[in-house]
A protein has these predicted regions:
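Short beta-strand-centered segment that lines the nucleotide-binding/catalytic pocket of NTP-utilizing
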Residues: 50-65
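Hydrophobic anchor at the beta1->P-loop junction of P-loop NTPases
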Residues: 27-29
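Phosphate-binding P-loop
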Residues: 17-24
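The conserved Walker
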Residues: 33
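N-terminal pre-Walker A segment at the start of P-loop NTPase domains
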Residues: 1-16
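Conserved lysine of the Walker
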Residues: 37
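Short phosphate-coordinating micro-motif centered on Lys-Gly-acidic
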Residues: 1, 46, 81-148
Length: 148
């Protein structure tokens, strides 16, 4: 567990994760609007040495960044309501990209109610992250890793 006291601290945590990230990693982010999911992704991108400006792909659903140490696939499922919409948009192929790091905002929308997150990313390292708003400036960030 990590308590972030500012957006900069959230970015710094993400940067540490980005530095340790390896091909095939999947990071699923959950939390309310404004909890800091995109700030964490900005840090992950910085740790991966991504040069491009990172912002939430809420309307595009997906942003690919190929200018860093590893490709970063940043998905935002906020506007996606069903698995059929994910498939129609071609998003499922990005959930477990072996050649890069996939970060999924609103990952709970991807979860299949009858199967676990782990089975959907079999063979990948999965970090499940929950961001909670504690105050205007503080966030509780809890995470759990599974897989190789």
């Amino acid at each position: 567990m990590f308590i972030s006291r500012s957006p900069d601290e959230t970015v710094a945590l993400g940067e540490r994760w980005g530095r340790e990230a390896q091909s095939g990693w999947v990071i699923g982010l959950t939390g309310d609007l404004g909890a800091g999911k995109t700030q964490l992704v900005k840090g992950i991108a910085r740790g991966l040495e991504v040069i491009a400006r990172v912002h939430s792909p809420t309307f595009a659903l997906l942003h690919e960044y190929n200018d860093g140490r590893l490709p970063l696939f940043h998905l935002d499922l906020y506007r996606v309501e069903t698995r059929a919409e994910m498939v129609a948009a071609g998003l499922e192929e990005y959930f477990c990209r072996p050649n890069g790091v996939t970060v999924i905002e609103w990952a709970e929308r991807w979860l299949d109610p009858v199967s676990s997150f782990e089975s959907q990313v079999a063979g990948s390292r999965l970090r499940r992250v929950r961001l909670e708003v504690l105050s205007d400036t503080q966030r509780r960030i809890t995470y759990e890793d599974s897989g190789p």
